Amino acid sequence: MELDFDRAGIEHRTKKLEVGDYVNPENPALVVDRKRNLDELCANLCSGDRGRFWREIRRAKAMGVKLIILCEHGGAVKTIRDVARWRSRYSPFGGRDLMERIYRVHISYGVEFLFCDKRRTGEQIVRLLGRLS
């Protein structure tokens, strides 16, 4: 990821954030949280170990932060609707279950869910954080 930022000439530093993984200091009201695939997203939204993620979602809303979840699943998953066809080898939850949870979080908390190929993650983060809130 650092290489993508370096190539784009973007100054960056590592620091713990209250919410998410990436923020543009010039626009702290917009944050990107990266998920490596739908299995990780499903674990965060559906499993018994989801408390930390839900606290982060609530914290973002309380802070007035627009949270974007960027899932690096790739393949045929380009939109939330595509999630319905997903099948996990690890989770008892299916794609339709996950899609419904995603929609609930989007409607209740204003969280935006986007999907990209892993090779495009850095480029997507740069594009998203350059956008106005």
What are these regions (language model features)?
Residues 30-36:
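Conserved catalytic cores of phosphodiester-cleaving nucleases, focusing on short active-site segments
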Residues 1-27, 40-133:
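Non-catalytic C-terminal interaction segments of nucleic acid-processing enzymes
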